[in-house]
Structures are given as structure tokens and as C-alpha cells.
Amino acid sequence: MRTLWIVAVCLIGVEGNLFQFARMINGKLGAFSVWNYISYGCYCGWGGQGTPKDATDRCCFVHDCCYGGVKGCNPKLAIYSYSFQRGNIVCGRNNGCLRTICECDRVAANCFHQNKNTYNKEYKFLSSSKCRQRSEQC
């Protein structure tokens, strides 16, 4: 029974919002593009601190701030509806916090696309020692 519970929790994480966000990024930038943003700069990936290194990193900072303002559900697990229409991400008929989460993810995916020319490979797997400046306010 415990094994079944662990599998269920893992599947929720895979089917949840972070997976949807990854699909949005890949849809805007191409297959497997999400891997470029998993550990980039000071804000792309788990946590975040310091000053964003470039426009790409700022996309992640804004996304973190957006998630920080979500009330009523967990932005990393909640499942919302969305679609791609003529290359544009369109959030579906979501209510309340699901709508907010979808918009956070849509804006970030579009931001990555709009700022893809600022992506700097030197910021991939950036040491946290490079992000020790005082964090900006959302």
C-alpha cells in the first residue's frame, strides 16, 4: 500500500502544473527546450535569490513572484486547462487560482521566447555564490 501511495504522489507531480509549464516552454521554444531553464541564472530552477543575471533570468524571477502571489492552491501541483492556438498559449476556462497559475506560466513561457537571444550558456548551472546580492522585491 505504501508503494502505491508513493507512485500516486509521483504521478501527481508529473501530471501537475510543472509538467504543464514544461509543455508550454517546449511548445514555444521547441522540444526539450525546458532543460535549458531548469538550472539557469539565479532564479530559474528551485528557489532563487540575488539579482537576475539577464532578461531570461528575469523571466524566472517574475514567474517566482507570480507564483508567490497565488492563494488557494499549490501552483506546482494544480492542474489547469490551456491550449495552443496558432502558436499562442491560451488559458482555458479556469477559475480563481488555476487561472492565475496558468497566466503565470503562459507569461513566463512567452517571456522565454521573447528573450531567447539573451540566453547565455555561462549562466547554466550558475554557482549560488554568484547570486549572493540582496534579492529584489517582487
From Swiss-Prot:
InterPro entries the UniProt entry points to = PLipase_A2, PLipase_A2_Asp_AS, PLipase_A2_dom, PLipase_A2_dom_sf, PLipase_A2_His_AS
Please indicate if the UniProt record lists Ribosomal protein as a keyword: no
Reaction equations catalysed: a 1,2-diacyl-sn-glycero-3-phosphocholine + H2O = a 1-acyl-sn-glycero-3-phosphocholine + a fatty acid + H(+)
What's the chief localization of this chain? secreted
Q: How is the cofactor bound?
A: Binds 1 Ca(2+) ion.
Q: Which GO terms describe its biological process?
A: arachidonate secretion; lipid catabolic process; negative regulation of T cell proliferation; phospholipid metabolic process
Q: Which residues act catalytically here? A: H63, D105
A UniProt-annotated Pfam family: Phospholip_A2_1
Instruction: For this UniProt record, give its keywords in alphabetical order, as a comma-separated list.
Output: Calcium, Disulfide bond, Hydrolase, Lipid degradation, Lipid metabolism, Metal-binding, Neurotoxin, Presynaptic neurotoxin, Secreted, Signal, Toxin
Q: What is its EC number?
A: 3.1.1.4
Superkingdom classification of source: Eukaryota
Q: Which GO terms describe its cellular component?
A: extracellular region
* Binding positions for Ca(2+) per the UniProt entry: Y43, G45, G47, D64
Signal peptide as annotated in the record: 1-16
Q: Which PROSITE patterns match?
A: PA2_ASP (PS00119), PA2_HIS (PS00118)
Q: Which cofactor does it need?
A: Ca(2+)
Write out the annotated subcellular location. Answer: Secreted
| GO MF annotation, one | calcium ion binding
**Tissue expression, per UniProt?**
Expressed by the venom gland.
Q: Which cysteines are joined by disulfide bonds?
A: C42-C131, C44-C60, C59-C111, C65-C138, C66-C104, C73-C97, C91-C102
How it assembles, according to the record, is:
Heterodimer of a weakly toxic basic protein having phospholipase A2 activity (RV-4) and a non-toxic acidic protein which inhibits its enzymatic activity but potentiates its lethal potency and neurotoxicity (RV-7).
- Functional description taken from the UniProt entry: Heterodimer RV-4/RV-7: acts as a presynaptic neurotoxin.
| Recorded family membership | Belongs to the phospholipase A2 family. Group II subfamily. D49 sub-subfamily.
What name does the UniProt record give this protein? Basic phospholipase A2 RV-4
